Amino acid sequence: MAVSNASVVLSPNLETSSSWYHHNPSSSLDLIRIHTLPMNKMTRRGLIQRVRCETSPSSDSSPLDKLKNSPAIDRYTRERSSIVVIGLSFHTSPLEMRERLAIPEAEWPLAITQLCALNHIEEAAVLSTCNRIEIYVSALSRYRGVKEVTEWMSKRSGIPVSDICQHRFLLYNKDATQHLFQVSAGLESLVIGENQIQSQVRKAEQVVKQEGFGRIISTLFEKANKAGKRVRAQTNIASGAVSVSSAAVELALTKLPGSVSSAMMLVIGAGEMGKRIIEHLVAKGCTKMVVMNRSEDKVAAIRKEMQSGVEIIYKPLDEILACAAEANVIFTSTSSETPLFLKEHVEILPPCPADYARLFVDISVPRNVGSCVAELDSARVYNVDDLKEVVAANKEDRARKSMEALPIIREETIEFEGWRDSLQTFPTIRKLRSKTERIRAECVEKLISKHGNGMDKKTREAVEKQTRIIVNNILDYPMKHLRYDGTGSSKLRETLENMQAVNRIYELDGELLEEKIREKKDKK
């Protein structure tokens, strides 16, 4: 039986993820269908592994692809810098773990600086949202790099390495690239096609570029934004798509015994998520609500955008308990790293005005409403992971839309990987010149030592000049075949195959890796 050649490390508790779909186009639809079937976790995992194992590598793989994927000859993937994503998402990990690992946007630059200081990490980027925490790195050694990043995540969050390993997913190179492109396009979102994730990917790109942390990862995120835009422009993936905010409103309304017009609504947080909640509440017929925020400016701006007849009352955050006492439904979407509501806060609130349990819908990560609040009979608490029941109704439509987007994702992935592969020839050219120059210099030095004082300065200069000419002439033909001019994939494949041959013949792979590690240690 042929085995899929995807470089994915599965954790024991890993659930399905659409990042697996691209390993073989013919198996993509089967995997999406498996993901949407009602079954327990063990059954689903078994079916997925069966589908993936029955997938054979493409018969028209280039020699370079065969070299990259050969189990016997993996120097290419071991010695070249690898793009790696170490991630945890709502597919693979509980909310309790994700909120401890979450990195606020304001701390992304510091996190990137710390990651790039690790011995085997050249470049890094952070993507932390309510549904995922993903670290993208360019690693000198994929195995050491993964180990260092995982230990960094453990140290930062206080979660044991073993627990992170149990729930993380790892993707390398092309798989990591395609995964990010799918994330940007909304294919990996809880709500397929939602737009907010693309703005979050764009923010991650801006942070990487502002901090100047490397060309590979910044270009990766730049191309991910391009892929996301193409998918939304050229497919129907965003048509009728709900967002996390709209799903939160839908969930609240399904749990609300009375009508939306008679319920007292409290929205805490007027950022992008909070604004979307307000818009969806208005669309559902809510004409009055209280909105709390650190400052009134954002609330005033939202109020101006709303239609006439909608009353939005601003309250400062220090009045949170007084406002909560008057509300039937409370939405929270702030960036606070500590809970706004704990059990001791909620249990002293007067009974809900309509004499039923007060609803808390918390779409923040870390959570704004402590899990202990759910222990109270007077409160019903829902978080981002509870939104799955809202979006479960349109699984078939989501699967169809995902299939529309995959050809674009594959095309963009091939383009980026071609660009990245073309960069690999430059270190080879530099190292080949360095090695031949070292050999030439050693031979000239031996010649001079042998003849001693019998060689005058003029003769020495002539020897230096002629030996350099000889070396340059010898290198002329290899160098021509190591330079990629950007004219097509077939030329690129040929160039990369030549590069691998030169690396192998002249034993440059180990030297390239050692040089990079030495340079990084020198900088530190």
Swiss-Prot record:
Site-annotated residues for Important for activity: 179
Predominant subcellular localization, coarse grouping: plastid
Misc. comment: During catalysis, the active site Cys acts as a nucleophile attacking the alpha-carbonyl group of tRNA-bound glutamate with the formation of a thioester intermediate between enzyme and glutamate, and the concomitant release of tRNA(Glu). The thioester intermediate is finally reduced by direct hydride transfer from NADPH, to form the product GSA.
Cellular compartments per GO CC: chloroplast
Residues of the active site: 130
Designated name of the protein: Probable glutamyl-tRNA reductase 3, chloroplastic
Subcellular location: Plastid, Chloroplast
Lineage, uppermost ranks: Eukaryota, Viridiplantae, Streptophyta, Embryophyta, Tracheophyta
Catalytic function, reaction form: (S)-4-amino-5-oxopentanoate + tRNA(Glu) + NADP(+) = L-glutamyl-tRNA(Glu) + NADPH + H(+)
Pfam family for this entry, one: Shikimate_DH
Assigned keywords, A-Z: Chlorophyll biosynthesis, Chloroplast, NADP, Oxidoreductase, Plastid, Porphyrin biosynthesis, Transit peptide
Enzymatic class: oxidoreductase
InterPro entries: 4pyrrol_synth_GluRdtase, 4pyrrol_synth_GluRdtase_dimer, 4pyrrol_synth_GluRdtase_N, GluRdtase_CS, GluRdtase_dimer_dom_sf, GluRdtase_N_sf, NAD(P)-bd_dom_sf, Shikm_DH/Glu-tRNA_Rdtase
Family label: Belongs to the glutamyl-tRNA reductase family.
Residues binding NADP(+), per UniProt: 269-274
Transit peptide: 1-52
Pathway: Porphyrin-containing compound metabolism; protoporphyrin-IX biosynthesis; 5-aminolevulinate from L-glutamyl-tRNA(Glu): step 1/2; Porphyrin-containing compound metabolism; chlorophyll biosynthesis
Gene: HEMA3
BP GO annotations: chlorophyll biosynthetic process; protoporphyrinogen IX biosynthetic process
Chain positions recorded as substrate binding sites: 129-132, 189, 194-196, 200
Source domain of life: Eukaryota
Keyword Transit peptide among record annotations: yes
